[in-house]
Amino acid sequence: MAKVPVRKPKKKQNPLKAAKIEAVDYKDTALLRKFISDRGKIRARRVTGVSVQEQRQIAKAIKNAREMALLPYSSSAR
């Protein structure tokens, strides 16, 4: 029996580096919405393709934007 070749998953491109964004700002809601699911949850690193440090910045910016009422805490899924 021959072994089935295992494919390595393709590395996701970093969306922040592609858009040439150095700092994540809580006032940039258009950018932050890309990292929020349709249910209003913050998307995981493995889904978005950002680094650990950038994921922390994004999470902090989303939480600040929610506090300032720029983003909803949850979406109207129902």
UniProtKB/Swiss-Prot annotation:
Function: Binds as a heterodimer with protein bS6 to the central domain of the 16S rRNA, where it helps stabilize the platform of the 30S subunit.
A Pfam family that the UniProt record links to this protein: Ribosomal_S18
Gene3D superfamilies linked: Ribosomal protein S18
Lineage, highest ranks first: Bacteria, Bacillati, Actinomycetota, Actinomycetes, Kineosporiales
Any GO molecular function: structural constituent of ribosome
Keywords: Ribonucleoprotein, Ribosomal protein, RNA-binding, rRNA-binding
Keyword Ribosomal protein: yes
The keyword RNA-binding is assigned to this record: yes
Family to which the UniProt record says this protein belongs: Belongs to the bacterial ribosomal protein bS18 family.
Signal peptide range: none
Protein name: Small ribosomal subunit protein bS18
GO biological process terms on file: translation
Gene Ontology annotations for the cellular component aspect, listed alphabetically: cytosolic small ribosomal subunit
Assembly: Part of the 30S ribosomal subunit. Forms a tight heterodimer with protein bS6.
